[in-house]
């Protein structure tokens, strides 16, 4: 990937689902810091300190799975329910005339956006 970047065939390098140890190793052992890291992120999995770490390194974070994992096949024997059924989200939604799904989406869409200075 670093070679592609130097040829101009790509504009940036991004990663997905790396742990902090993997990210630290990547930053220490490569010549290019990733521009973006895609992580699972929702009210049950906010990863605030990891997101702050990325910010300190100049790495933009994007999130996927804003409603948590809705697929029961991945869950253990313990039933944890669905994020969109979370009573706290429903209560906040009721206060603002929004669904719990809209509240969950709003949690991450209200974060500050890092703006780049290149226009592609």
Stretches with model-predicted labels:
Residues 1-120:
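Beta/alpha (TIM)-barrel catalytic core signal, keyed to glycine-rich beta->alpha loops juxtaposed to Asp/Glu
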């Amino acid at each position: 990937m670093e070679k592609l970047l130097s040829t101009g065939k790509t504009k940036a390098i991004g990663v997905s689902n790396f742990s902090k140890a993997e990210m630290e190793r990547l930053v220490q052992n490569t010549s290019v810091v990733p521009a973006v890291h895609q992580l699972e992120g929702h009210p049950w999995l906010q990863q605030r300190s990891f997101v702050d770490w990325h910010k300190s390194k100049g790495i933009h974070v994007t999130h996927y799975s804003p409603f948590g994992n809705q697929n029961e096949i991945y869950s253990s024997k313990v039933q944890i329910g669905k994020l969109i059924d979370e009573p706290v989200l429903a209560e906040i939604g009721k206060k603002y005339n929004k669904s719990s799904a809209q509240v969950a989406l709003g949690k991450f869409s209200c974060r500050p956006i890092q703006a780049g200075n290149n226009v592609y």
